Amino acid sequence: MSAMKITFLIAVAGHLLCGVCDCLLTYMPGGRFHFEDMKDNGRLSAVFKGMPLRNSLLSMLLGCLAMFLFAFGYLALAHWMRAFSETCAVLMLIGTVMVLTFGVAHHVFCGMPEWLYVKMGRTEEARQLITEFFTKTSVTLIVCYLGFLIFGVSLFVPVVSGWTPLPRWACVFNILPLMLVLMPTRVGGSGNWAGAIMFLGLLLLF
């Protein structure tokens, strides 16, 4: 098995693990968490009732490990692209760095408020605190997904244009269109399931 395929396998494992971590922050004993629940403490408290504190801690810690793992796949693709488009390769590298730096912060900033909310007894004061915290740190989410956008477009254009040895239809194995398909389903961890599908598809094509 080539080194490229090994990095793709590691990336698949990383995205699957990160998807599980997302689900730990999304699906609670009281039901599915929606951001709209943060507007009403009655709804929010009902969702988080009975949630073990270890869930958010595991999500934060394993999420950092997961992003470390899937970094190998993105960096390998950026390096591979250099043979066909130096510009796209640089953009893919920039997008990857944006995802890894701001994405790790965002993952921790999602887990920490949930841990604090439960630790503080799911009170109205706790709800106000975590809402303010999440709002003021939401830039990490924006930059992370901007990085995915830059990476996805920079991979999509060369493949669909025929600049690479991959068949043009291989452009579907790209995190951007896969995320656009999965996100309307509102399933927890949709971005990571999209990433796992992308690397699994590319694993079969390389």
Where are the language model's segments positioned?
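Hydrophobic, aromatic-enriched alpha-helical segments typical of multi-pass transmembrane helices
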Residues: 1-206
